[in-house]
Amino acid sequence: MRAFLGRKIEAPYSLVDMARDGVALLDHLGHRTAHVVGVSMGGMIAQTMAAHFRDRVASLTSIMSTTGRRTVGWQDPRLAPMMLVQRSSREAYIATSEKLWKMIGSPAYPDTAEAVRERAAETWDRGVSRAGVARQIAAILTQPDRTRELRTVDVPTLVVHGLADKMVHVSGGRATARSISGAELLLVPGM
């Protein structure tokens, strides 16, 4: 909660740590490079990987993400109460997920309520960790602005962002594309 209020916190791990995990996975699989794709927080990690481990990234696709600069890629403030709801049972998790996806889902590409409930049930059954989610949010909220780092990225880059995105405002995608020389920006209406 302190991080949401703009207070300084210490995150247990950072986006750089998670990018390093991606490189470790490449090493484990015996791959020198990969075409790296990330969505939302995954896009932040993919961007970080491309900036910090340039020799390991063959191309970058950043989807519905942002640079870490606080003036772009903001979240619709109406989502905050929904993001902070405690979901302590499977049924509560499914119900809250359904409400959340009604708010953040793509208006032009809606999921059925049944599909959202099934995905939420699968997520709960795999194991939802409130502490893990809190650590990931801390990593996002304590990330530095990557704009300067992104200027060093010199691999083919595609930035995809929905024009109706409530979770990460389209300004985040635009800023990402502007930060990477030669990046292609694909804006999707209704997403």
Predicted regions and their residues:
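Residue in the alpha/beta-hydrolase core beta-strand immediately N-terminal to the catalytic nucleophile
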Residues: 35, 58-61, 151
